[in-house]
């Protein structure tokens, strides 16, 4: 790579940084005054002319300055040397805030709120995917001899509680047998096969009697719990942040808000995240969604012990602080996985 090309990239990097910070088109004199580029204003003007000819920057109609294009942002992101890590104090604060969540729902609500505050963009977190969760533990609590509370706890921290009306009361020995049978059928199995296992248990046990009745009724309730598709749920935070950047979206803000409300497009983008720790940046038309033509999406996956629970990320204008956003998304995802994995 030649020195002229390296220098032009430094000019591009400076244009991106200044435009993100100021929202104002950037001129050559401004770049020379603000950045130690080591060349004259005339050289910077020539470099900007080349960058414009190659499609990395463009000139708004009402200004003599230049702004980055989607191609320019992509070049900037692809050539990020490093992403500034968070300080140990910042990391401790994030972990402490998430650890204070009382359950899965609370942890994810805290995460989406925190990410929106850190990035000043729209944050999205997907509920743990049914297809990757396993049953960690099943608890059976007798509320009365004929009424049970079933508690399903998954490896992703999801806790689902269901009441079972038995009709016929069972004694302590039968309760213990029921607990053992259901636990053996479910614990350690993926949710996608656990529902089949508990149905098979009820079928194989068959017959009459109080235990068979209790297994059958419990199985019916558990199947309903296990087949709920919670991966189709998204938590959103910071939607009001979009209104701060209305001009950045041109006339596409309404369609973007509709896409967020319907969730389908966002879920499709998050579904592509299959590897925790890897952050993906999609800029403008790279989202392959017409509704998001003026937006950038920074996504990753969260999980624990090598298993992906779900996707999460940030959505905002292409005029985005990419290094800061990437760092924040990666950090919050890391600590969500750590918190859920330790529960």
Swiss-Prot record:
Keyword terms: Repressor, Stress response, Transcription, Transcription regulation
TM helices/strands, residue ranges: none
Example of a GO biological process term: negative regulation of DNA-templated transcription
InterPro entries associated with the record: GAF-like_dom_sf, HrcA, HrcA_C, WH-like_DNA-bd_sf, WH_DNA-bd_sf, WHTH_transcript_rep_HrcA_IDD
Keyword Transcription listed: yes
Pfam families for the chain: HrcA
Gene Ontology MF terms in the entry: DNA binding
Top-level lineage group: Bacteria
Family of the protein in this entry: Belongs to the HrcA family.
Role, per record: Negative regulator of class I heat shock genes (grpE-dnaK-dnaJ and groELS operons). Prevents heat-shock induction of these operons.
NCBIfam families, alphabetized: hrcA
Protein name: Heat-inducible transcription repressor HrcA
């Amino acid at each position: 790579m030649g020195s002229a090309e390296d220098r032009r990239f430094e000019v591009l990097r400076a244009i991106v940084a200044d435009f993100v910070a100021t929202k104002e088109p950037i001129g050559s004199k401004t770049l020379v005054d603000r950045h130690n580029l080591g060349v004259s204003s005339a050289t910077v003007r020539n470099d900007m002319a080349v960058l414009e000819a190659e499609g990395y920057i463009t000139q708004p109609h009402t200004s003599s300055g230049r702004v980055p294009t989607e191609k320019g942002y992509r070049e900037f992101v692809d050539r990020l040397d490093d992403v500034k890590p968070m300080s140990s104090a910042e990391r401790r604060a994030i972990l402490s805030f998430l650890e204070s969540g009382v359950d899965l729902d609370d942890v994810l609500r805290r995460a989406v709120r925190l990410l929106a505050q850190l990035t000043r963009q729209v944050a999205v977190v997907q509920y743990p995917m049914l297809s990757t969760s396993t049953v960690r533990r099943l608890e059976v609590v007798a509320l009365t001899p004929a009424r049970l509370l079933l508690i399903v706890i998954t490896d992703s921290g999801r806790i689902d509680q269901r009441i079972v009306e038995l009709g016929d009361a069972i004694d302590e020995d039968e309760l213990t047998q029921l607990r053992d049978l259901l636990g053996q059928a479910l614990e350690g199995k993926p949710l996608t096969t656990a529902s089949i296992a508990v149905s098979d248990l009820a079928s194989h046990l068959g017959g009459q009697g109080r235990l068979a009745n209790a297994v059958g009724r419990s199985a019916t309730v558990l199947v309903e719990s296990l087949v709920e598709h919670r991966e189709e749920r998204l938590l959103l935070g910071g939607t009001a942040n979009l209104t701060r950047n209305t001009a950045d979206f041109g006339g596409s803000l309404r369609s973007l808000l509709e896409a967020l409300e319907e969730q389908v497009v966002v879920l499709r983008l998050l579904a592509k995240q299959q590897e925790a720790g890897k952050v993906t940046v999609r800029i403008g038309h790279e989202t392959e969604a017409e509704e998001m033509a003026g937006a950038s999406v920074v996504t990753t996956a969260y999980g624990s012990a090598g298993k992906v629970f779900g996707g999460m990320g940030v959505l905002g204008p292409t005029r985005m602080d990419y290094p800061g956003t990437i760092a924040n998304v990666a950090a919050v995802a890391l600590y969500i996985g750590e918190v859920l994995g330790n529960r």
